[in-house]
Amino acid sequence: MESFDNIYLDLSNQPGKCKLAETGLGWRPSGGGDTFTLDSSNIGAAQWSRAAKGYELKILSRSSGVIQLDGFDQEDFERLSKAFKIWYGINVESREHALRGWNWGKAEFTKAELAFNVQNRPAFEVPYSEISNTNLAGKNEVAVELSLSVDPNGSKPAGSTKNRGRKAAAGPDELVEMRFYIPGTAVKTENGIKGENADEKNGGEGEENGEEQNAANLFYELLMEKAEIGDVAGDTFATFLDVLHLTPRGRFDIDMYESSFRLRGKTYDYKIQYSSIKKFFLLPKNDDTHTLIVLGLEPPLRQGQTRYPFLVMQLKLDEEISLELNMTEELLETRYKDKLEPRYEEPIHQVITKIFRGLSGKKVIMPSKDFVSHHGHSGVKCSIKANEGLLYFLDKSLIFVPKPATYIQMENVAVVTMSRVGGAISASRTFDITVSLKAGMGEHQFSNINREEQQPLEEFFKAKNIRIKNEMSDDTNALIAAALDNDDMMSSDEDGGGRPDRGSADEDEESVDEDFQADSDSDVAEEYDSAHESSGSGSDAEMDDASDAGVDEDEDADADMSEEERPKKKSKTGK
């Protein structure tokens, strides 16, 4: 038996001990945990190369993908190669990596990984098990999305081997996407792909019968097949065609497999594990015609630089479907007993919900019975900034859909503030609510809510023991007080002596004369024409005093005096 210390398995953060014996090899983490074993009959090939923590032994297994053991010393090569030759009958191949730094080369599709070679030396390899999705990003460009770490919160011990073939304990920074530019055309042969002026990437003959196609398309199709992203990812239990998705926007076919489901669109394809579904909502729309199925994903769905933490489907309530599951009776009775039925014949939204629930094991969350809107619906129409949507009130949370999908847990809510923005007439018909979160976690504002929904919202938040701050009553009192002040000012003006003569300076500052009720189209005629008859309640003399520019402020001045001052004002105005 050969033993090696401080060896890292599959990019783990924690080292362990690796042991080789005639029956196979094993690895146990130093801090304790599950032991990984590999039977000798499952070892297909082995490669030795320089790596991050010293030297790496890469084992290509017959059924378990790629196993990476890093941390060996250079002197360990002789012991390892001798043990593999005697016990397993395998020669350990010593490989040197390409260190030129070139970003162009040849792609090689091996049994378990995609290798990128520069001058016939590997620059890097990507195991197929690490590829979550691939898309045609352009005519000659293929995007490859990589799986995120199994447990981003680090709840599992470092070095865990429960998810073979995936990163056991990755660091905080990860590579999530790569893009390959593949120009020109290529020929797909029986044994591989041959470029226009290049040798075959997978070797073999028979290119005479091959059909010349776009090289990027062939690369994409072969990667889909190797990484088991497409139809070859096991047996399809059920398929739903042309389902409308609001987030991400488009129509997708849904293929449901044993451990994952796939969304197939015209431009993008997505492969999503059921284990990524953290929340499952069934939300009826206010139009009584459609319903929404919302899936909360962690890690979120990615489309380039855009993340979609929620998947939102919209389905018609009256659309019936007849579906028979593509599943053996034995599998249905053992693994999915009381979870799935062999045949469904009911509305499509119920069928999709039941199959998703059966395969993922997630509980379906529906709107709370404690809330009914003014019009008898489960959702309230509102908007986040310029995006309109529906806000649903659940037993333990709030959710706004479709875009941007926003999820708020009740336990994190500190206070809900109801307010009216601005003093426009429309503000009296609508109001806003601001949900402030505890511990400075921020706030969410929902705008343009119908005024009739105020009472149902207040009753719901009170039932959930959430503090409510109503700023609308303060705004209403302020508006009423301002209106009363305006009425007092108008009545005092009409009485004549209620307001003192403020002089011409104050008259110039007036933007609107609310007491003006003249039949004439000219303000100047009312102010200066002595023959003009006011429609107000006071006498001509009182109106003249009120219109005086303040040249003579003596209260005993008669009307003749006022008339003598008027020509001066006219000549002053004309300058």
UniProtKB/Swiss-Prot annotation:
**Which locations, inside or outside the cell, does it occupy?**
Nucleus; Chromosome
Which stretches of sequence are listed as region Disordered?
Answer: 148-169, 191-211, 484-575
- Tell me the keywords, alphabetical order: Chromosome, DNA damage, DNA repair, DNA replication, Nucleus, Transcription, Transcription regulation
Q: Compositional bias (Acidic residues) at which positions?
A: 485-495, 506-528, 541-563
The entry lists its GO molecular-function terms as:
DNA binding; histone binding; nucleosome binding
Q: Where is the composition biased (Basic and acidic residues)?
A: 191-204, 496-505
Tell me the Gene3D superfamilies matching this sequence: 2.30.29.150, Pleckstrin-homology domain (PH domain)/Phosphotyrosine-binding domain (PTB), Structure-specific recognition protein (SSRP1)
Recorded superkingdom = Eukaryota
Q: What does this protein do?
A: Component of the FACT complex, a general chromatin factor that acts to reorganize nucleosomes. The FACT complex is involved in multiple processes that require DNA as a template such as mRNA elongation, DNA replication and DNA repair. During transcription elongation the FACT complex acts as a histone chaperone that both destabilizes and restores nucleosomal structure.
**Could you tell me what this protein is called?**
FACT complex subunit pob3
